[in-house]
């Protein structure tokens, strides 16, 4: 179909999208068959450019602030019309996809992009249904025009690019953004607002299933190990990043994975390595003369990425869903070396650590954060994506854990034997050993030791993991230095938690001085 001599490519195949992208100079083929693209000066999400339209349905329901910035409805209408007119005057690409794998909870989405590669990215990350919108639900529209430049004075944006969610009109406008992760996270934020209304907990987590049907969830910020640890050759992958937990079901919000590529190796991450082939997209990965990806090269960014459909993963849940979780794991990357490799949490501790979301920003996905590593507290292990007040999500989590009897664990994928620069980071095989012990049920009734100050209970033995690692104090040469570091971390937790209005039982479940 054409509009004023411009071609509109609707629901063309992945192979055709690759062909169009290369023909238009949008990217190049790597030796492994993937399409390699560069995203320009933005190599991560841009939180300061993200807005939600303020209207009656959102006015009192959103936690407005630095993360959820309000945008006027009239300004949105003017900008949408401007971007749409601009895009209609050039070739563009349309695909029809679902967001949400469970029949009851999917959103039908018409995704329009100015570039072929971003459409391919959306096809990797969202769900390509056998039949589009069988239930006849109201359609959402994503309009993603990377070559449109916003003018802040005219458009009301913060810069030349923007991401704006409009719940009343079921529209997502993305303009001036080449980093495709914005598209994925925008639709995640949409579901994160809508699902709690249906008594479903939206989660920034990975999920997989064992041979016996047991489900494990892995919560964590980018770089803490969600994708790596859930990609386990002995288990079936549901998904690596975004899920919903309703009564009787855990379902993927997406149909693909978005894996960090920095220092990717076939030995440590075979599932991800094999998934990067024709049909996948590599963002900001450097190629050598033979077009072989050099995953160790971070000259473009620490946040290099691979997008691939779940079909590229051999062992996966065919329907992108499973039952409720036996094990819920909070992954934290602790820079201080204070937290143990694994702690067993009760319900109050689960609520406390879910709300705290303590971790480190590792090779951050956000622009302007630099390549450094720093500690952070990110509520629900994904504060940038949760529009409602944090308590809404925490209450739903505890409700689900209690109803199903899920066991909850805090797993440190960060430092041991000292803080960052002194100690060393837990290696992936050690953490995999911890995860395997959790999934086998070995820790359900394990004998524990209580750690004062940080107020956590750790198992005295974990099959396959060195016992001397389990109590972090034992791994420090200077025990007094450990105690001081523990007090310092406890102070950070206590200070951060002051903003939450919760029961005394939950407050008492955190670190104590």
From Swiss-Prot:
Keywords: ATP-binding, Cytoplasm, Decarboxylase, Gluconeogenesis, Lyase, Manganese, Metal-binding, Nucleotide-binding. Its main location: cytoplasm. Gene3D superfamilies: 3.90.228.20, Phosphoenolpyruvate Carboxykinase, domain 1, Phosphoenolpyruvate Carboxykinase, domain 2. The lineage of its organism: Bacteria, Pseudomonadati, Pseudomonadota, Gammaproteobacteria, Pseudomonadales. It holds the Pfam family PEPCK_ATP. Mn(2+) binds at residues 185, 204, 241. Transmembrane segments: none annotated. This is Phosphoenolpyruvate carboxykinase (ATP). PROSITE patterns: PEPCK_ATP (PS00532). One of its GO terms (cellular component) is cytosol. Pathway: Carbohydrate biosynthesis; gluconeogenesis.
